[in-house]
């Protein structure tokens, strides 16, 4: 029996949290990310990872979640196949924590962040590096990265 893809498992977990979030929007406050000063004062460092589990549910369409999961699947699947489960997870979590720290430092004291975008942008970076090493065409990936970056400021 073929083992389940790590990417599919992550998507299932994140989407499961989103469904729970629809029933209890307080989960965003439990798992979302604060600005660095509040993060330090509360000592809730787990939020650097749990931020990926919660997404905006304030509108009727889960656009933020959909874009993150589409990117996770589109980028994560070939990266996991090429590099293996362990290296994929290292890239995912290092990117997630790095993106969360960058976000926390830029938020200020009362800022708040949600979503898996930090991990997704890390996967974009890994995809570009792999593509360059394999002499692949990465121009279209760069365009998608730019579009996702711009979209991040509109959602």
Model segments located where?
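A detector for small-residue-rich transmembrane helices and their helix-helix packing motifs
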Residues: 1-155
